[in-house]
Amino acid sequence: MNKDCIFAAPIEKLGDFTFDENVAEVFPDMIQRSVPGYSNIITAIGMFAERFVTANSLVYDLGCSRGAATLSARRHITQPNVKIIGVDNSLPMVERCRQHINAYQSDIPVEILCDDIRNIKIENASMVILNFTLQFVPQQDRQLLLEKIYQGLNPNGGLVLSEKFRFENKKMDDLLIDFHHQFKRANGYSELEVSQKRTALENVMRTDSIETHKERLKSAGFSQIELWFQCFNFGSMVAIK
C-alpha cells in the first residue's frame, strides 16, 4: 500500500482537492488514516449485501473509488444472477478499481463505469451504495439523486449512505472536528498535512447534518431510515424501501 504524502510538503498554490492520479495511487492508505471506522463500514457493507441482495437484481456502488465496497458486497452475495455496477467520475480511480476487482475471482460480474453518478439510470436494484460520495455531489442535486435511487430500488431494497457529518450545535461540531484531527495525527499525519487537506477540501466537500440526510431520504420516499454507525463526525445510514 502506497503511503499518502500528498500534503506533506508546503504547497504554495493550494488548489481544490481532486481525485486525480496522485490521490488514486495512495487512496487506500489515505482513507484508512483519514476516516474513523472506515474498515468497519466496508465490512458491514458486505453484511448488508448478504441481507438485501436478491436473485436477478443489480447492485450499484455509486462513487466506487478503488472498489473496496464493491468487493465487500460481492464476497457476501449468495443469490444467483446478480450483477454489480460501480461508477466513478475519476478515470485514475476507475482504472485501479478494474485492476483491483479483476485480481479476485468470482462468478458475480462487475462492470465499472467512468461517469458522473447523476447520469446513471438506477433500475432493478436490490442494493445501492453511496460510500462517502454524496458529500461531493452539488447540494442542489442531492435530493434528485436520492429520488432516482429510491425509484430504481426494488421493494425491500436497501441504500447504504456513508458520510462526514456536520452538527448544528457549534460546540459539538468543533469538538468532533478536533477529535477527527486528533485521529489523523495519531495515524501519522502532520499539522501541515491536516491543515492543507482541510483547505483543499473546503470548496469541494459540503457536509450535511444527520437531520438533513434523514429529511432528504424521507422526502425521496424511504420510510425506514436509521443511523447504524457513527464515529466522531463520520457515520453511515441505512434506508430501506
From Swiss-Prot:
Keywords: S-adenosyl-L-methionine, Transferase. S-adenosyl-L-methionine binds at residues 38, 63-65, 88-89, 116-117, 131, 198. HAMAP family: Cx_SAM_synthase (MF_01589). This is Carboxy-S-adenosyl-L-methionine synthase. The keyword Transferase applies. It is an enzyme of class 2 (transferase). PANTHER family: CARBOXY-S-ADENOSYL-L-METHIONINE SYNTHASE, TRANS-ACONITATE 2-METHYLTRANSFERASE-RELATED. GO terms for biological process: tRNA wobble uridine modification. The gene is cmoA. Its EC number is 2.1.3.-. Signal peptide: none annotated. Belongs to the class I-like SAM-binding methyltransferase superfamily. Cx-SAM synthase family.
